[in-house]
A protein has these predicted regions:
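Metalloprotease/metallohydrolase-associated module, dominated by Zn2+-dependent proteases
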Residues: 1, 74-125, 134, 183
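Topogenic membrane-insertion module of multi-pass membrane proteins
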Residues: 1-26, 85-88
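Small-residue-rich helix-interface/hinge motifs
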Residues: 19-77, 111-115, 119
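Helix-coil boundary and interhelical linker segments in multi-pass alpha-helical membrane proteins
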Residues: 20-26, 96-114, 166-174
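Juxtamembrane/interfacial segments flanking transmembrane helices
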Residues: 51-55, 124-142, 195-199
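Multi-pass membrane catalytic core of lipid/isoprenoid biosynthesis enzymes
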Residues: 59-94, 147-170
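Membrane interface segments of multi-pass transport proteins and intramembrane proteases
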Residues: 98-107, 137-152
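C-terminal transmembrane module of polytopic alpha-helical membrane proteins
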Residues: 143, 148-261
Length: 261
Protein backbone atom coordinates (compact mmCIF):
# COMPACT_ATOMS: atom_id res chain seq x y z
CA UNK A 1 0.00 0.00 0.00
CA UNK A 2 1.53 3.37 -1.01
CA UNK A 3 2.00 5.85 1.82
CA UNK A 4 0.15 9.14 1.38
CA UNK A 5 2.05 12.29 2.33
CA UNK A 6 -0.11 15.13 3.61
CA UNK A 7 1.16 18.67 4.16
CA UNK A 8 -1.12 21.05 6.04
CA UNK A 9 -1.69 24.57 4.75
CA UNK A 10 -0.42 25.99 8.02
CA UNK A 11 2.84 24.08 7.54
CA UNK A 12 3.32 25.73 4.14
CA UNK A 13 2.65 29.13 5.73
CA UNK A 14 5.21 28.51 8.49
CA UNK A 15 7.79 27.35 5.92
CA UNK A 16 7.19 30.45 3.79
CA UNK A 17 7.56 32.77 6.79
CA UNK A 18 10.76 30.97 7.79
CA UNK A 19 12.16 31.38 4.28
CA UNK A 20 11.46 35.09 4.05
CA UNK A 21 12.68 35.74 7.61
CA UNK A 22 15.98 33.89 6.94
CA UNK A 23 15.06 31.13 9.41
CA UNK A 24 14.96 28.38 6.80
CA UNK A 25 18.27 26.79 7.87
CA UNK A 26 17.36 26.42 11.58
CA UNK A 27 13.90 25.17 10.58
CA UNK A 28 15.54 22.66 8.24
CA UNK A 29 17.65 21.27 11.08
CA UNK A 30 14.57 20.92 13.29
CA UNK A 31 12.67 19.21 10.49
CA UNK A 32 15.56 16.78 9.98
CA UNK A 33 15.57 15.86 13.68
CA UNK A 34 11.82 15.23 13.61
CA UNK A 35 12.03 13.30 10.33
CA UNK A 36 14.78 11.07 11.71
CA UNK A 37 12.69 10.46 14.83
CA UNK A 38 9.71 9.48 12.70
CA UNK A 39 11.83 7.24 10.49
CA UNK A 40 12.62 5.14 13.57
CA UNK A 41 8.91 4.61 14.18
CA UNK A 42 8.30 3.90 10.49
CA UNK A 43 11.06 1.30 10.19
CA UNK A 44 9.82 -0.80 13.12
CA UNK A 45 6.19 -0.39 12.06
CA UNK A 46 7.19 -1.80 8.66
CA UNK A 47 9.24 -4.53 10.36
CA UNK A 48 6.23 -5.69 12.39
CA UNK A 49 3.87 -5.37 9.39
CA UNK A 50 1.79 -2.46 10.67
CA UNK A 51 0.36 -0.83 7.52
CA UNK A 52 1.41 2.83 7.28
CA UNK A 53 -1.49 4.72 5.78
CA UNK A 54 -0.27 8.32 5.87
CA UNK A 55 2.61 10.61 6.82
CA UNK A 56 1.42 14.07 7.84
CA UNK A 57 3.80 17.04 7.90
CA UNK A 58 2.58 19.45 10.56
CA UNK A 59 4.02 22.77 11.81
CA UNK A 60 5.09 21.21 15.11
CA UNK A 61 6.34 17.87 13.78
CA UNK A 62 5.39 14.81 11.80
CA UNK A 63 2.74 12.16 12.36
CA UNK A 64 2.42 8.59 11.15
CA UNK A 65 -1.01 7.09 10.70
CA UNK A 66 -0.87 3.34 11.42
CA UNK A 67 -3.70 0.87 11.03
CA UNK A 68 -4.74 -0.83 14.28
CA UNK A 69 -1.94 0.63 16.38
CA UNK A 70 -3.05 0.01 19.96
CA UNK A 71 -4.80 -3.26 19.12
CA UNK A 72 -1.89 -5.55 18.22
CA UNK A 73 0.97 -6.96 20.26
CA UNK A 74 1.93 -4.52 23.03
CA UNK A 75 5.58 -5.61 23.07
CA UNK A 76 5.91 -4.93 19.34
CA UNK A 77 4.39 -1.50 19.83
CA UNK A 78 6.89 -0.78 22.61
CA UNK A 79 9.68 -1.45 20.11
CA UNK A 80 8.01 0.82 17.52
CA UNK A 81 7.76 3.63 20.06
CA UNK A 82 11.29 3.15 21.37
CA UNK A 83 12.61 3.08 17.81
CA UNK A 84 11.73 6.73 17.27
CA UNK A 85 13.26 7.81 20.57
CA UNK A 86 16.45 5.85 19.85
CA UNK A 87 17.08 7.92 16.71
CA UNK A 88 17.89 10.92 18.90
CA UNK A 89 21.12 9.11 19.77
CA UNK A 90 22.14 9.32 16.11
CA UNK A 91 22.01 13.13 16.01
CA UNK A 92 25.07 13.78 18.24
CA UNK A 93 27.11 11.27 16.23
CA UNK A 94 26.03 12.68 12.88
CA UNK A 95 26.40 16.36 13.72
CA UNK A 96 29.57 15.73 15.71
CA UNK A 97 31.09 14.18 12.61
CA UNK A 98 29.91 17.09 10.46
CA UNK A 99 31.44 19.56 12.92
CA UNK A 100 34.82 17.80 12.73
CA UNK A 101 34.66 18.02 8.94
CA UNK A 102 33.72 21.70 9.09
CA UNK A 103 30.18 21.12 7.86
CA UNK A 104 28.57 22.93 10.80
CA UNK A 105 29.93 25.54 13.18
CA UNK A 106 30.44 24.88 16.90
CA UNK A 107 27.62 27.31 17.67
CA UNK A 108 25.24 25.49 15.32
CA UNK A 109 26.34 22.14 16.76
CA UNK A 110 25.48 23.25 20.30
CA UNK A 111 22.13 24.62 19.13
CA UNK A 112 21.19 21.44 17.24
CA UNK A 113 22.16 19.24 20.18
CA UNK A 114 20.08 21.41 22.51
CA UNK A 115 17.05 21.15 20.19
CA UNK A 116 17.57 17.40 19.85
CA UNK A 117 17.70 16.99 23.63
CA UNK A 118 14.57 19.13 24.10
CA UNK A 119 12.59 17.13 21.52
CA UNK A 120 13.67 13.87 23.15
CA UNK A 121 12.81 15.00 26.68
CA UNK A 122 9.43 16.33 25.56
CA UNK A 123 8.56 13.06 23.81
CA UNK A 124 9.47 10.87 26.79
CA UNK A 125 7.08 12.73 29.09
CA UNK A 126 4.56 10.10 30.28
CA UNK A 127 1.67 12.05 28.78
CA UNK A 128 -0.70 10.58 26.21
CA UNK A 129 -0.45 10.74 23.17
CA UNK A 130 3.30 11.46 23.33
CA UNK A 131 5.68 8.54 22.90
CA UNK A 132 6.27 8.38 26.65
CA UNK A 133 2.54 8.22 27.32
CA UNK A 134 2.06 5.50 24.72
CA UNK A 135 4.93 3.51 26.22
CA UNK A 136 3.19 3.71 29.60
CA UNK A 137 -0.04 2.65 27.89
CA UNK A 138 1.61 -0.39 26.28
CA UNK A 139 3.17 -1.39 29.60
CA UNK A 140 -0.23 -1.22 31.33
CA UNK A 141 -1.64 -3.39 28.54
CA UNK A 142 0.99 -6.05 29.20
CA UNK A 143 -0.42 -6.73 32.66
CA UNK A 144 -3.93 -5.26 33.04
CA UNK A 145 -7.32 -5.73 31.36
CA UNK A 146 -7.89 -3.46 28.38
CA UNK A 147 -10.42 -1.09 29.92
CA UNK A 148 -8.43 -0.72 33.13
CA UNK A 149 -5.22 -0.01 31.21
CA UNK A 150 -6.93 2.61 29.07
CA UNK A 151 -8.52 4.33 32.06
CA UNK A 152 -5.20 4.49 33.93
CA UNK A 153 -3.30 5.75 30.88
CA UNK A 154 -5.69 8.53 29.99
CA UNK A 155 -6.72 9.47 33.53
CA UNK A 156 -3.18 9.81 34.86
CA UNK A 157 -2.11 11.65 31.71
CA UNK A 158 -4.99 14.13 32.03
CA UNK A 159 -3.95 14.82 35.63
CA UNK A 160 -0.25 14.97 34.78
CA UNK A 161 -0.49 17.33 31.80
CA UNK A 162 -1.29 20.50 33.82
CA UNK A 163 1.32 19.52 36.42
CA UNK A 164 3.99 19.07 33.75
CA UNK A 165 3.11 22.45 32.26
CA UNK A 166 3.45 24.19 35.63
CA UNK A 167 6.56 22.35 36.82
CA UNK A 168 8.64 21.82 33.68
CA UNK A 169 7.85 24.53 31.17
CA UNK A 170 7.82 28.31 30.85
CA UNK A 171 4.39 29.89 30.70
CA UNK A 172 4.56 31.26 27.15
CA UNK A 173 1.72 31.13 24.61
CA UNK A 174 3.30 28.39 22.46
CA UNK A 175 3.90 26.11 25.44
CA UNK A 176 0.40 26.79 26.70
CA UNK A 177 -0.99 25.86 23.30
CA UNK A 178 0.95 22.57 23.14
CA UNK A 179 -0.08 21.45 26.62
CA UNK A 180 -3.62 22.67 26.02
CA UNK A 181 -3.73 20.46 22.93
CA UNK A 182 -2.44 17.46 24.92
CA UNK A 183 -5.05 18.04 27.61
CA UNK A 184 -7.82 18.29 25.01
CA UNK A 185 -6.68 15.00 23.42
CA UNK A 186 -6.87 13.35 26.83
CA UNK A 187 -10.39 14.63 27.44
CA UNK A 188 -11.55 13.39 24.03
CA UNK A 189 -9.83 10.03 24.54
CA UNK A 190 -11.48 9.67 27.96
CA UNK A 191 -14.90 10.12 26.40
CA UNK A 192 -14.05 7.60 23.66
CA UNK A 193 -12.87 4.84 25.99
CA UNK A 194 -15.91 2.65 25.38
CA UNK A 195 -15.56 2.97 21.60
CA UNK A 196 -11.84 2.14 21.78
CA UNK A 197 -12.60 -0.99 23.81
CA UNK A 198 -15.27 -2.15 21.36
CA UNK A 199 -12.89 -1.59 18.46
CA UNK A 200 -10.23 -3.66 20.23
CA UNK A 201 -12.72 -6.48 20.92
CA UNK A 202 -13.81 -6.52 17.29
CA UNK A 203 -10.18 -6.57 16.16
CA UNK A 204 -9.54 -9.60 18.38
CA UNK A 205 -12.57 -11.39 16.96
CA UNK A 206 -11.23 -10.96 13.43
CA UNK A 207 -7.56 -11.47 14.40
CA UNK A 208 -7.38 -14.24 17.05
CA UNK A 209 -4.23 -14.22 19.17
CA UNK A 210 -1.94 -17.04 20.27
CA UNK A 211 -0.84 -15.58 23.61
CA UNK A 212 -0.56 -17.59 26.86
CA UNK A 213 -3.86 -18.44 28.52
CA UNK A 214 -5.35 -16.22 31.24
CA UNK A 215 -8.26 -17.43 33.39
CA UNK A 216 -10.24 -14.64 35.07
CA UNK A 217 -13.73 -13.42 35.96
CA UNK A 218 -13.63 -9.95 34.36
CA UNK A 219 -15.94 -9.02 31.49
CA UNK A 220 -12.92 -7.67 29.65
CA UNK A 221 -9.86 -8.96 27.79
CA UNK A 222 -6.19 -8.94 28.66
CA UNK A 223 -4.46 -7.75 25.51
CA UNK A 224 -1.39 -9.97 25.94
CA UNK A 225 -3.28 -13.14 26.84
CA UNK A 226 -5.74 -15.58 25.35
CA UNK A 227 -8.64 -15.03 27.72
CA UNK A 228 -10.81 -17.69 29.32
CA UNK A 229 -13.57 -16.07 31.35
CA UNK A 230 -15.09 -17.81 34.35
CA UNK A 231 -18.85 -17.19 34.45
CA UNK A 232 -21.63 -18.67 36.62
CA UNK A 233 -22.52 -21.06 33.81
CA UNK A 234 -18.95 -22.28 33.31
CA UNK A 235 -15.88 -21.35 31.29
CA UNK A 236 -16.13 -19.16 28.20
CA UNK A 237 -13.23 -18.93 25.76
CA UNK A 238 -12.22 -15.61 24.25
CA UNK A 239 -13.69 -16.42 20.83
CA UNK A 240 -17.01 -17.51 22.33
CA UNK A 241 -17.13 -14.38 24.52
CA UNK A 242 -16.48 -12.15 21.51
CA UNK A 243 -18.95 -14.02 19.29
CA UNK A 244 -21.63 -13.61 21.95
CA UNK A 245 -20.84 -9.89 22.02
CA UNK A 246 -20.84 -9.24 18.27
CA UNK A 247 -22.31 -12.28 16.56
CA UNK A 248 -20.68 -13.35 13.30
CA UNK A 249 -18.48 -10.51 12.05
CA UNK A 250 -17.45 -9.80 8.49
CA UNK A 251 -14.16 -8.21 7.43
CA UNK A 252 -13.12 -5.45 9.80
CA UNK A 253 -12.82 -2.08 8.12
CA UNK A 254 -9.55 -0.30 8.89
CA UNK A 255 -9.76 2.26 11.67
CA UNK A 256 -6.29 3.84 11.65
CA UNK A 257 -4.74 5.26 14.78
CA UNK A 258 -2.01 7.87 14.74
CA UNK A 259 0.52 9.47 17.01
CA UNK A 260 1.82 13.01 16.77
CA UNK A 261 5.45 14.01 17.25
Amino acid sequence: MPVKIKVSGFTILVAALAFFSHAAVPLGHIFFILALHESGHAFWAWFFHYPIRQLSILPFGLALTLEHFGDGDAWEELVILAGGLAMHGVIPLLYGGLAKLGGVSPVMLDWVLDINRSVFLFNVLPLYPLDGGRIVQSLWHCFLPYRTAQALTIGLSALGTPLAFVKLMNCNPMTLGVFGFLFAVNLISWRQRAYQAEHFYLYRLIHPCSHPLKLHRKQDLYRQRYNVILEPGGLLGEKQWLTRRFGKAGPLSSQPRSWLI
